[in-house]
Each structure stands twice: as C-alpha cells, then as structure tokens.
C-alpha cells in the first residue's frame, strides 16, 4: 500500500484533477448499461421490436439484427448522461477550481501518492439550506482505480467533515446516482442518511431514467442540540 497525503488543491494539479474526474465518470458507463438492460420497460422494448419485425416481415434474421443494433444503441445512450455531465462540469465549476471552490467559501482537496493526484473531493456552501441549517455540499469525490481499497475515499470525506465542522456547518450533503453503488455503500457506511430521491438523468424520457439520491450527514453535536 503506497503512502498518500491529502492537501489543498493547487493550480498545478488542474490537468491531473480533470483527467481523474473524467475517467472516473466514464467508468460508470458499463454499470449504466447493465442497469438499463434490467429495466422492465427496456426488456419489453427489446421483446416487442423484434417480434414486430417477425410478424411484419417474417424474418428471424432481421429480428436478430434488430436486437443487435438496439443493444448497440442502448450502449451508446447509456454513456451519454455521463459524457454530458463531464462536459457541463468542465464548463462550470471545474473550469476554474480555484475560483469555484477556494474563492467561494469552500475548498477542494487532492490525495497525492508518489507525486501523482490519485483522489479528489470538493466542498461548497449550500446557497438555500433548510431553515436553521448551515449545509456544505460535497462534490467530485473520486479515487484512481489503481488506488482504491486503501481508505483514500473515506479520508477525503473525513477531510470535508473536518472542514465543515470547523466552519460551523450543521450538515454535509451530497447527491449521487443509483448507478454508483460503491459510492452509495461508502456514504451509508460513513453515516450519511438518504433524505431524498428524484429522477433526473434521462436517456430516453419514456424509456430510461436514472434516479438521483440525496444524502445528508448531520454532525452529532447538532443532532443533540436539536433534541
């Protein structure tokens, strides 16, 4: 296990951070494709279309070809939301990390090992938190595939916890998709609670929609105070 350190983001980290973020998002595409295939509406669609071709044209070969191209199309479509998200982030908060995070009452950290950036996480104040709450939102938690299983992700989340606690925040919140099961497992193991769920990432609105889960971690002292 190679040693690592967590430090605040510096401008020289930019290319490595963006590369790690982009690769991490693309890793979710196979899981998104598998998730898509198991949806009832997808299975129905894959059954009805070839059956229609057999009934209309009487050709099983044409039906098999249809299934092949439908699967190929679904594979391409499954990756589009993640590609769009990366493109959006690179035009917004990730375009200038210093301005978006460090100069906006938040912060951004990297995990460094062997001179390379192997993990990232950011935190920003929530603009309109619930009444009586002061919340920080966690963004862009990512760890290089070669450095997972070393506790880096947990250490990065704890770094956000410490920063938020020191700044007087009552909660840390975040959002992630149902596709990212390893992230969901991590957050729940660290004490985050599911506080909401909504559908946002749509491949084809009438066919496939990925749900977004909202998580909240409330600091124990805050919970005791409310009691």
From Swiss-Prot:
It is an enzyme of class 2 (transferase). GO terms for biological process: determination of left/right symmetry; gastrulation with mouth forming second; heart development; negative regulation of cell adhesion. GO terms for molecular function: N-acetyltransferase activity. Residues 69-213 form the N-acetyltransferase domain. It is found in: Membrane. GO terms for cellular component: endoplasmic reticulum; Golgi apparatus; membrane. Signal peptide: none annotated. It is a multi-pass membrane protein. The chain crosses the membrane at residues 29-49, 53-73, 201-221. Keywords: Acyltransferase, Developmental protein, Gastrulation, Membrane, Transferase, Transmembrane, Transmembrane helix. Pfam families: Acetyltransf_1. Coiled coil: none annotated. Its main location: membrane. Its EC number is 2.3.1.-. May play a role in regulation of gastrulation. Belongs to the camello family. This is Probable N-acetyltransferase family 8 member 5. It comes from Mus musculus (Mouse). The lineage of its organism: Eukaryota, Metazoa, Chordata, Craniata, Vertebrata. The gene is Nat8f5.
């Amino acid at each position: 296990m190679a040693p690592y350190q967590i430090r605040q983001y510096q401008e020289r980290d930019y290319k490595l951070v963006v590369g790690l973020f982009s690769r991490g998002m693309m890793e979710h595409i196979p899981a998104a494709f598998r998730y898509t295939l198991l949806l009832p509406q997808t299975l129905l669609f894959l059954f009805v279309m070839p059956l229609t071709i057999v009934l209309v044209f009487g050709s099983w070969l044409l039906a098999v070809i249809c299934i092949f191209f439908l699967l190929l199309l679904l594979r391409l479509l499954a990756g589009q939301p993640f590609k769009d998200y990366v493109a959006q982030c690179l035009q917004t908060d990730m375009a200038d990390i210093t301005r978006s995070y460090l100069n906006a009452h938040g912060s951004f950290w990297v995990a460094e090992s062997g001179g390379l950036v192997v993990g990232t996480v950011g935190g920003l104040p929530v603009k309109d938190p619930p009444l009586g709450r002061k919340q920080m939102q966690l963004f862009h938690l990512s760890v290089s595939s070669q450095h997972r299983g070393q506790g880096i992700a947990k250490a990065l989340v704890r770094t956000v916890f410490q920063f938020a606690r020191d700044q007087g925040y009552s909660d840390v919140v975040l959002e992630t998709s149902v596709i990212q099961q390893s992230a969901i497992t991590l957050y729940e193991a660290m004490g985050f609670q599911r506080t909401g769920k909504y559908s946002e990432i749509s491949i084809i609105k009438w066919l496939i929609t990925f749900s977004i889960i909202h998580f909240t971690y409330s600091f124990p002292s805050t919970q005791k105070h409310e009691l």
